[in-house]
């Protein structure tokens, strides 16, 4: 019994995700696909537009055989920590043999070479990066420009491609924890990441979200698997959409409650950024205005939004220090994959639970992370058009389709 792992957000699930799951099974020869999915918040620093249970069910109905939750400290993190959290869950689950991911280049060997460069940066390359940062570039832009100046074009290009960057970090994470997972790059088809263009039955998740927010939901039907469109229509105006603006005042309130020292302890706050946040949240009452006031070439908007979401949720310190707090929360499985769940219980190095009552299996640090996950679900629920009672997300049984 072979399984391939995928780390994803499915925000929302679309035809490109179904294609990736199909190709991942084909390329790996796996019988099952295990998806590690971000929960209530995603890497762009926003709440997931649709609640996690609905997104998990969409994945199970369209190629995934099991969906595991990626805890918020890793879902709301840089590419490095996001990848490390997902890879650690897959590796310690004991049931994944490989990890597949979308890639602009589709060349696993090239990504291996890129990972080697990051793990062994020459002093000259480091100096170029520092020089670019001193000119006001964000770290990702400074690094990409330095690589463009220092590396062969073919190798440098992968550092400017969002999915390739994640692929590189998956490979680095595998090496970092000495995992046996085999990385498999799946060439992207259709449109680029975050593109507003369409190609056949494909468009980006960001374009689908844009169409939903602008009231043009009827235009997304061609780009999502059959059945999901009706699901979306049934929840829009009730449990969706959840957006950053939906939690605007709550986020500004959370920022205003914090001292400069507390702001400094948030993940990714460096170089005096706490001073800018401290001033901006006292000048503006809207999170969009706060972000605009703080934004500069040095900080990407995604990074700033992640910091603000961490303030709202009470996430402090580096996610790298939370690896020993991980547990495996199974959101759902396919009925035909019951044997996969049995194998998970047998082989996992981490506590496994499928219902809230199983939290007694967790140690103190894992219980703290579990409490954070409950808090994230409760806060995300406040952003719904019809807010939900607390802990409602954890009161449901395991999804079986």
Regions found by a protein language model. Name each.
Residues 25, 56-60, 172-175, 209:
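Class I S-adenosyl-L-methionine
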Residues 1-55:
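N-terminal catalytic cores of NTP/NDP-binding nucleotidyl/phosphoryl-transfer enzymes
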Residues 49-53, 61, 77-84:
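Generic alpha-helical scaffold signal
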Residues 56-71:
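A glycine-rich helix N-cap at a beta->alpha junction
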Residues 8, 42-43, 59, 73-74, ...:
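Short, contiguous strand/loop micro-motifs
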Residues 25-26, 60, 87, 91-92:
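Non-catalytic positions within long, well-ordered alpha-helices that form the structural scaffold/packing
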Residues 69-401:
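Active-site cores that bind ATP or allylic diphosphates and position pyrophosphate for catalysis
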Residues 31, 65, 97:
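Receiver (REC) domain switch/active-site residues of two-component response regulators
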């Amino acid at each position: 019994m072979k399984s391939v792992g995928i780390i994803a957000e499915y925000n929302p699930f679309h035809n490109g995700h179904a294609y990736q799951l199909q190709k991942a099974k084909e390329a790996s020869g796996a019988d099952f696909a295990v998806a590690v999915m971000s929960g209530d918040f995603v890497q762009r620093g926003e709440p997931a537009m649709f609640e996690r249970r609905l997104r998990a069910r969409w994945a199970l109905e369209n190629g995934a055989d099991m969906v595991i939750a990626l805890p918020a400290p890793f879902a709301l993190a840089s590419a490095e920590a996001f990848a490390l959290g997902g890879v650690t869950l897959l590796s310690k689950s004991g049931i994944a043999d490989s990890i597949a991911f979308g890639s602009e280049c589709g060349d696993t060997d090239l990504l291996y070479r890129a990972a080697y460069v990051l793990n062994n940066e020459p002093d000259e390359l480091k100096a170029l990066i520092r020089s670019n940062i001193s000119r006001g570039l964000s770290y990702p832009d400074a690094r990409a420009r330095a690589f463009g100046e220092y590396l062969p074009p073919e190798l440098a290009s992968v550092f400017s491609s969002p999915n390739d960057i994640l692929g590189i970090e998956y490979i680095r994470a595998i090496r970092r924890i000495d995992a046996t997972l085999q990385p498999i790059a799946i060439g992207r088809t259709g449109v680029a990441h975050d593109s507003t263009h369409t190609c056949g039955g494909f468009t980006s998740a960001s374009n689908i979200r844009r169409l939903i927010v602008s009231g043009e939901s009827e235009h997304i039907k061609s780009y999502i698997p059959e059945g999901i469109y009706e699901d979306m229509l049934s929840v829009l105006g009730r449990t969706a959409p959840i957006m950053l603006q939906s939690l605007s005042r709550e986020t500004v309130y959370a920022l205003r409650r914090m001292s400069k020292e507390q702001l400094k302890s948030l993940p990714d706050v460096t170089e005096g950024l706490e001073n800018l946040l401290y001033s901006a949240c006292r000048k503006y009452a809207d999170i969009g205005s706060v972000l605009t006031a703080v934004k500069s070439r040095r900080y990407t908007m995604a990074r700033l939004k992640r910091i603000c979401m961490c303030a709202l949720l009470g996430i402090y310190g580096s996610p790298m220090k939370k690896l020993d707090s991980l547990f495996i929360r199974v959101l759902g499985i396919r009925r035909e994959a019951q044997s996969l769940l049995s194998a998970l219980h047998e082989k996992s190095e981490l506590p496994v639970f499928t219902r809230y009552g199983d939290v007694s299996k967790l140690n103190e640090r894992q219980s703290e992370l579990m409490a954070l996950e409950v808090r994230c679900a409760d806060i995300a629920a406040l952003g719904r058009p019809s807010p939900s009672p607390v802990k409602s997300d954890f009161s449901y049984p395991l999804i079986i389709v």
